[in-house]
A protein has these predicted regions:
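The beta1-alpha1 cofactor-binding region of Rossmann-like NAD(H)/NADP(H)-dependent oxidoreductases
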Residues: 37, 57-68, 100
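Substrate-binding pocket helix/loop in short-chain dehydrogenase/reductase
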Residues: 94-95, 99-104
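Conserved glycine-rich cofactor-binding loop
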Residues: 5, 12-13
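Conserved glycine-rich Rossmann-like NAD(P)H-binding loop of the short-chain dehydrogenase/reductase
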Residues: 26-43
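SDR active-site lid
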Residues: 171-232, 250
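Residue(s) in the substrate-gating loop at a strand-loop-helix junction
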Residues: 138
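Active-site helix of classical SDR
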Residues: 118, 154
Length: 259
């Protein structure tokens, strides 16, 4: 990865920070983006390799901030080889009761922010004739979550975006990888937009680590995969839902009764 430049959004903690660290450990120059510049800088020092890392404030809901961060990156490193769309927020509420303003706020980050970042970085990658865009989605983008309809819908949309963009950008030498983690042990579950935080399943229960997700991201990138589902034990569940959705929904309803 020496000589490669990687940009990671939502990099101040959790999966984003773990991805930034792994790519930096493999020799890449890494730019950590976060809405909070102080948190991004703190993550940069935890990542290490400060001679070839950069921390910048960037709210993916604001195109001008994306363009500014990209401009600084190109000024410092001259290129972008990998752009990781990791910034995201959650929401737990019943579909019939959720506040539409909160739902729109979630989509602004999870979906429209991903599109905005892709549109910003693609011209630079086209100029190089090479590049990889990695979208961090979720297993919830394959199997919808009760009381998590907006989050699941945003991740279904990210999955579809990745598939379409992959076909469109192939002729430009740009690859699009979608990574779908299951439950991850991070602070993400505590950072919900909606007030009903008590409905969320604890992320510490049978979850995987952010570092494991980062390894899956790196391996998927190196092998030029189209999609990675992590942990692999979630793959049968995804396939089962595609074939027998009623059975999976029955099982999920039973599990919800125990929460």
């Amino acid at each position: 990865m020496e000589g490669k430049v990687v940009v990671v959004t939502g990099a101040s903690m959790g999966i984003g920070e773990a991805i930034a660290k792994l790519f930096a450990d493999h020799g890449a120059s890494v730019v950590l983006l976060s809405r909070d510049s102080s948190r991004a800088e703190a993550a940069r020092h935890r990542v290490g390799h400060t001679d070839r890392t950069l921390a910048l404030a960037c709210d993916v809901r604001q195109r001008e901030e994306i363009d500014r961060a990209l401009g600084v990156t190109l000024h410092h490193f001259d290129r972008v080889d990998v752009w990781v769309n990791n910034a995201g927020v959650g929401m737990r509420d019943a579909a019939a009761d959720m506040e539409m303003s909160v739902c729109r706020e979630l989509f602004e980050t999870n979906f429209f922010g991903t599109i905005a970042c892709m549109q910003a970085v693609v011209p630079a990658m086209r100029e190089e004739g090479d590049g990889t865009i990695i979208n961090i989605s979720s297993v919830a983008g394959h199997i919808p979550l009760a009381f998590g309809a907006p989050y699941s819908a945003s991740k279904f949309a990210v999955n579809a975006l990745g598939k379409a963009a992959r076909m469109e950008l192939k002729r430009d030498g740009i690859h699009v990888l979608t990574v779908c983690p299951g439950y991850v042990r991070t602070e993400f579950g505590a950072n919900m937009l909606a007030a009903r935080k008590g409905n969320i399943r604890p992320q510490s229960v049978r979850g995987i680590t952010a570092e494991r997700v980062a390894r899956a991201v790196y391996k998927g990138y190196r092998k030029r995969r189209r999609e990675v589902i992590v942990p692999w034990t979630m793959i049968p569940a995804v396939k089962l839902y595609q074939l027998f959705p009623g059975l999976v929904e029955w099982g999920m309803a039973k599990a919800m009764q125990k929460l």
